[in-house]
Amino acid sequence: MKTYSAKPSEIEKKWWVIDAKNIVLGRLASRVANMLRGKHKPSFTPHLDCGDNIIIINAEHVKLTGKKANPRDGKIYYRYTGFPGGIKDTTAGKILSGKHPERVIKMAVKRMITRNALGAKQMSNLYVYANSDHPHMAQQPTVYDFAGQNPKNKK
């Protein structure tokens, strides 16, 4: 028996909507990363974009466990400006309470996806919104009950 390898014409993408209200960030990000890659499908092919399209709503209400949400000594995100001494930092709590709280989920998922051209294509299938409104109703997304899968997913 030969190993099955999907062709680009055989791939069917599905639309999912996930409500991130009171959901633990790391658990959500790892599940979304697997779904973006397509590893939940039996027809998974590593070199093709066979993952689904995912819409995450209520990103501003995602939960962090432990001391990660603490604004003073919580989870710190670093970036480098390119200049000497140009390391800037911000915390997850500041981002969640700031102007773009959806960036916390996008960064968590992006760091779990492969860092190449295929990973960039898979990340383009992720749509994150801070509140419950999204413009993808025409795609008729299926509701994915992430909170009901495991009691630890919800906080």
Curated annotation (Swiss-Prot):
Pfam families: Ribosomal_L13
Classification via Gene3D superfamilies: Ribosomal protein L13 (3.90.1180.10)
One GO cellular component term noted in the UniProt record for this chain: cytosolic large ribosomal subunit
Keyword Ribonucleoprotein attached: yes
Molecular function GO terms recorded: mRNA binding; structural constituent of ribosome
HAMAP family the UniProt entry points to: Ribosomal_uL13
PANTHER family on file: LARGE RIBOSOMAL SUBUNIT PROTEIN UL13M, RIBOSOMAL PROTEIN L13
NCBIfam families: rplM_bact
Homology family: Belongs to the universal ribosomal protein uL13 family.
Descriptive protein name: Large ribosomal subunit protein uL13
Source species: Rickettsia akari (strain Hartford)
Name of the gene this protein is made from: rplM
